[in-house]
Amino acid sequence: MGASQTVLPFKLGATDESLTAHCGLALFGEYLRAIDVGGLIDHELPGPGSAAGYDPSAYVLPLVFMLAGGGRTLEDLRVLRNDTGLRSLLQLDDMPSSDATGDWLRRMGATASDGLKALQRVNRGVFRRLLRRDERTGYTLDIDATQIVAEKREAHYTYKGEKGYMPMVGHIAELGLVAGHEFREGNTAPAARNLEFMQACERKMPKEKRIAAVRADSAAYQAGIFNWCEETGKVFAIGADQDAAVKAVIAAIPESDWKTFRDGEIAETVHCMNKTNRAFRLIVMRRPRDQDLFEEQSPWRYHAVASNRDNEDATATMQWYSKRGDASENRIKELKIGFGMDTMPCGTFPANAVFFSIGALTYNLYLGFRSGALGSGWERSQVQTVRWRLFQTAGKVVRHGRQVFLKISAAMLDIFTAIRERCARIMREGGVVPETS
């Protein structure tokens, strides 16, 4: 093949026209403007130290757009910074560099700045606004700790033997929203401060809403959590820690009580801990274990769930508990893989805590955009699908006087128009995020 030959028969050429390969992100930006997220950020976060500095939203919003668009590192901000067409649509006239953004993350993470607490207030304001759009009053809280591997000098080893972090995340099962998050050191036990975390999530609920149910894995198998649920009228289903007492109770279940369930058998009994105020149901599932001829261990593998859900059989409770696989574990995967929270950009824990909080904010804003602006057919779309079908739409930005025109393919025109109309309606109906106090 000669030097001038190519595989496909097209030629390259440069243009001075204002083009963007991500003009669908302008729709996401229009939604953020409709609910005035930028105003909330500037109201809550510490401002610049001088008149020449950037407002907080000038740092946060580019990170939100970058994460929603598929970027994963601070260097990916350069793609947005160099996309003059998209920036003109988003009205990002002046944008900090990736190095300046990294410095800002470190400043916000410093204890004296109070930046992390301010971001929590922003997250709470957005969360409450989105929750108020839903007609329900009682919700299920799913919590789980998740490992983020990070070969940072200051990172600690997790219980899985890898250096990194172990944040705790709480989701509202019915809507998928992140109700709360706590960025934690890698050597923090998953069982640490579970009750305090649940209570913090509850405090973020609007006054007319409440957490009515709690689900968690065996890290939350704690008497304090069970007692709190009973005292506040919550139902719970929590994986049981198979300590000696639980094993003894399981061993005492009569063989006649076991019923076929899925690929194993299920039964239930009653149990209590030393410090629980009331006894609770213990639903036990067992599956056959592959055994060696000379092994003496039990032929069964057991999985137990503690619950106070009444008026239903063991299978119904186990099925309800199993739903946390989608409601919590899969949504954490979306937060980490879909929104880039599986890698941390900075070398210090506080700066990464700020970055993770912005990731959680982006996740919730995306859910609000999907449910409020995208319309029917998108309800369960993961962000990677929306990127491929919407965000990564090519367009040409044209200026005529003071007017800006976005030229897109005819096939996308009706979709863009409908989304923009929904964003305008959201703003007319009072889209501004409420006070965070």
Please provide the spans of the model-predicted regions.
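An anionic, glycine-rich sequence signature occurring as long contiguous blocks
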Residues: 1-10, 14-17, 235-337, 422-437
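Dynamic "connector" segments at or just before major functional cores
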Residues: 1-164, 169-188, 194-207, 393-437
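Short amphipathic alpha-helical "interface-anchor" segments enriched in bulky aromatics
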Residues: 31, 77, 317-358, 362-369
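Structural preference for beta-strand elements that scaffold enzyme active sites
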Residues: 138-142, 211-213, 235-237
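Acidic, metal-coordinating catalytic cores used for nucleic-acid/nucleotide bond scission
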Residues: 214-222, 242-244
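Short, surface-exposed basic-aromatic patches at helix termini and helix-loop junctions that form
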Residues: 226-234
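Basic, amphipathic alpha-helical segments enriched in Lys/Arg and hydrophobic/aromatic residues
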Residues: 341-415
